[in-house]
Amino acid sequence: MFGFFKKNKTLPTFAPLVTDMHCHLLPLVDDGSKSLEESLEVMEAMHEVGYEQIRLTPHFSYPRYQNDEDNILERYKNFCSEVEANRGDRKLPRMTSITGEYQIDDGFQAHVDSGKLLTYHFSDPKQGAEKGLLLVEFSLRQKRMGMDEAIFARTMEGYDVILAHPERYPYFNSHSQFLEQLKEQGVYFQVNILSLDGFYGPESQKKAFDYIENGWVDFLGSDMHNVGYAMALRHASTNKKIIKLMEKNEFLNAKLAIN
């Protein structure tokens, strides 16, 4: 279906990460993949740039994507079976599990109260302990009151928090005091690889590099959605600045590999 992928140059630049911990390839549950075939083609492209494993992270965002954890788990189970039945001779990354990307919004607390949050588990080499990690995001349009309190409350409930793509929020700058305070609270940051290649524009690109330079970034994610994103990721794999960054920095993605 998308055979033009094969014509484009690619490098296994992201092999050191082992695992992509942020992608939207469960079909028809959010703004990500629209079909099994699209997911298969995108997964094949992700394998080509070095990923051995991927973690699906569907949106939980009120009112746009009112997903239910039980339904998502059932869809994921069926999707895994469909992938195995239709992969043919494709080389694909292994799917390790499924995690939610939860927006801090009016529906967030209901997911917390349900006791069914879909989280990561990994061993933090800095602290020598296994942690449960909750992936959260903020609105891309405007800052919401109480965002820091919502994150602090989760830590008090025993969760550690990963903030998705802080570089994409227009209300934070390269030296945001708010983000610095979150780091002091122990919040992990995940930057989008495509931000580093300018996919979302120059402002997000600059902040992505600045946050890494600040020592704030713990994870890199593809935030993969569709074929267009896959083409952009292939382009990013040949970006010399990104290749150098991958050689210079060590991220925690691989610590999710055994889960």
Where are these regions (language model features)?
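Short acidic/histidine-rich active-site segments
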Residues: H59, V217-A232
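Mid-to-C-terminal alpha-helical segments outside catalytic/metal-binding sites
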Residues: L92-R94, R234-N259
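Histidine/acidic-residue-rich catalytic or RNA/ligand-binding cores of hydrolases
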Residues: N173-E180, Y200-F209, V227-K240
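Extended substrate/RNA-proximal surfaces in nucleic-acid metabolism proteins
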Residues: Q66-Q185
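An N-terminally biased module of ancient metal coordination in phosphate/nucleic-acid-related enzymes
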Residues: M1-M95
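His/Asp/Glu-enriched short active-site or ligand-binding loop at hydrolase and phosphoryl-transfer sites
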Residues: G186-G198
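Hydrophobic faces of well-ordered beta-strands that scaffold small-molecule active sites
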Residues: T19-C23, I54-L56, T96-I98, I104-D106, ...
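Non-catalytic positions within long, well-ordered alpha-helices that form the structural scaffold/packing
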Residues: H47, T155, I212-E213
